[in-house]
């Protein structure tokens, strides 16, 4: 079998400057971004793997029409839910947009919580086998016959490093790891470790053109309360009807990346009858809390970040002070 690889992408060019505003879900990123926009001529680049999809507005907490009109936004509503959007595509799009925004005399403000996108932009992407639809289809058939735990056991034989950090039912990541091995003959962990070594060598003595501001809670209970409030608001705004309309299209399945987004997966299962509708709220809140936990873990692996406690009453002022120190355009 011939092996084709996605092109390697380096981190953002050193002659570009931008500010990144990251944080877990419900940490107040949108409010902070709009506050920055009141003082600096910015254009916002969304760093959110769910906001790229059209027709997924309520469950993704997509910015309102008024918010989108107040400040130029990019990488929102650029894909149909039927089509996936990768970290490699994000890096190419973000680099292009950062350069274009800079050429317009404005500052690119990257805002979101998809940490894989941030990491890919900061550290670059090494060569990785391209997605292979045929191999993925075979894996889906095998999973239907044997179950994902069986495929997880197979992965443990060929890539124990990756298997050790994946749950036996993590279908998306197990499928990708086995796909990489079957296409290339090398485990996914091989490519990831090589990439890490390459980035250490490339970045030694270098400086980042980005300022990374990270909104992180000092009190998890505060964040959990906001998550519950937001999910309740989504349900009250017609989230279930939104998912029902997506299902009614007939061409979407629960295995698509778009439908695996937190909240959408739980709502789909409830509409399918595989999970009681009465449990949707609790399951959705729990899944969102787990997502926030993973996001915070990612953020803590980024030593260059400037942390602002999002549960501090002066959080917005602190964010603005960091931005003011970074740009002469602050007004």
Curated annotation (Swiss-Prot):
GO terms for biological process: tRNA modification. It holds the Pfam family IPPT. It comes from the Bacteria. Keywords: ATP-binding, Magnesium, Nucleotide-binding, Transferase, tRNA processing. GO terms for molecular function: ATP binding; tRNA dimethylallyltransferase activity. ATP binds at residues 23-30. Its cofactor is Mg(2+). SUPFAM superfamilies: P-loop containing nucleoside triphosphate hydrolases. Substrate binds at residues 25-30. Its EC number is 2.5.1.75. Coiled coil: none annotated. The record marks 114, 136 as: Interaction with substrate tRNA. InterPro entries: Dimethylallyltransferase (IPR039657), IPT (IPR018022), P-loop_NTPase (IPR027417). Residues 48-51, 172-176, 260-265, 293-300 are annotated as: Interaction with substrate tRNA. It catalyses: adenosine(37) in tRNA + dimethylallyl diphosphate = N(6)-dimethylallyladenosine(37) in tRNA + diphosphate. Monomer. Catalyzes the transfer of a dimethylallyl group onto the adenine at position 37 in tRNAs that read codons beginning with uridine, leading to the formation of N6-(dimethylallyl)adenosine (i(6)A). NCBIfam families: miaA (TIGR00174). Belongs to the IPP transferase family. HAMAP family: IPP_trans. This is tRNA dimethylallyltransferase. It comes from Polaromonas naphthalenivorans (strain CJ2).
């Amino acid at each position: 079998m011939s092996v084709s690889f996605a092109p390697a992408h380096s981190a953002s060019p050193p002659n570009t400057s931008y500010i990144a505003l990251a944080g877990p879900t419900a940490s107040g990123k949108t409010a902070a971004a709009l506050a920055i926009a009141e003082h600096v001529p910015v254009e916002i680049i969304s760093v959110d793997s769910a906001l790229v999809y059209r027709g997924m507005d309520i469950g993704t907490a997509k910015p309102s029409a008024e918010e989108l009109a107040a400040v130029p936004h990019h990488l929102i509503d650029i894909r149909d839910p039927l089509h996936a959007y990768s970290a490699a595509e994000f890096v190419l799009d973000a680099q292009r947009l950062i350069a274009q925004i800079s050429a317009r005399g404005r500052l690119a403000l990257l805002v979101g919580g998809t940490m894989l996108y941030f990491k890919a932009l900061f550290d670059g992407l090494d060569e990785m086998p391209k997605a292979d639809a045929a191999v993925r289809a075979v894996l889906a058939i095998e999973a239907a016959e044997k179950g994902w735990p069986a495929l997880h056991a197979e992965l443990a034989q060929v890539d124990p490093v990756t298997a050790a950090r994946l749950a036996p039912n993590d279908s998306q990541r197990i499928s990708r790891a086995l796909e990489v091995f079957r296409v290339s003959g090398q485990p996914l962990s091989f490519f990831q470790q090589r990439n890490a070594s390459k980035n250490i060598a490339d970045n030694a003595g270098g400086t980042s053109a980005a300022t990374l501001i990270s909104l992180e809670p000092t009190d998890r209970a505060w964040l959990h309360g906001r998550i519950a409030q937001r999910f309740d608001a989504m349900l009250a705004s017609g989230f279930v009807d939104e998912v029902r309309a997506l299902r009614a299209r007939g061409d979407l399945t629960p295995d698509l990346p778009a439908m695996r987004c937190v909240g959408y997966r739980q709502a789909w299962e409830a509409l399918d009858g595989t999970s009681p509708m009465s449990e949707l709220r609790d399951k959705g809140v729990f899944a969102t809390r787990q997502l926030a936990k993973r996001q915070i873990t990612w953020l803590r692996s980024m030593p260059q970040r400037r942390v602002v406690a999002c549960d501090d009453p002066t959080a917005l002022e602190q964010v603005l002070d960091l931005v003011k120190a970074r740009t002469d355009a602050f007004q």
